[in-house]
Amino acid sequence: MAHFQNQYSAPEVTQTDAYGNPTRRTDEYGNPIPTQETGRGILGIGGHHHGGHHGLHRTGSSSSSSSSSEDEGTGKKKKGLKERLKEKIPGNKEHQSQATSTTTPGQGPTYHQHHREERSDGQDQGEAPWSPQPLISCLWSAISY
């Protein structure tokens, strides 16, 4: 019955590479493709599919691979850009408490006062106009941290 095999002159599928080593055909996921043998049913008509897991199989911890939230091995959290900016902004509560009172040896604490500008007619105009320059310099120093 050997003469009945390949009766339509279909090209033979070689199971070896160019050096004669045996090879296995695999699908796009790397799973081996079973060879077709006679005597088996067609899949879907009484056949059984012995497939494996076609998705990604992950092992290890479920934590993110990004280590940006923790410092290198110390266990302390790194400060994000938001926290660094809060420290640098002049209107910050901590910044105000540091800037309002200073001590000089022998003189006691000195307190800084906000100066108000007066208009030419003698009336109080309020605080000086706001300038964005200190905020911009704080942002640049925080980003280049």
From Swiss-Prot:
Signal peptide stretch: none
Disulfide bonds, paired cysteine numbers: none
Comp. bias (Basic and acidic residues): 82-96
Biased composition annotated in UniProt, kind: Polar residues: 1-18, 97-107
GO BP term, pick one: cold acclimation
InterPro entries per record: Dehydrin, Dehydrin_CS
Ranges of compositional bias, category Basic residues: 47-57
Biased composition (Low complexity): 58-68
PANTHER family associated with the record: DEHYDRIN XERO 1, DEHYDRIN XERO 2-RELATED
Functional description taken from the UniProt entry: LEA protein are late embryogenesis abundant in higher plant seed embryos. There are two subsets of LEA proteins (5a, and 5b), the first ones are expressed when the cotyledon weight reach 80 mg and the second set are expressed above 100 mg. The function of those proteins is not known.
Similarity field: Belongs to the plant dehydrin family.
Name the record gives this protein: Late embryogenesis abundant protein D-11
Source taxonomy: Eukaryota, Viridiplantae, Streptophyta, Embryophyta, Tracheophyta
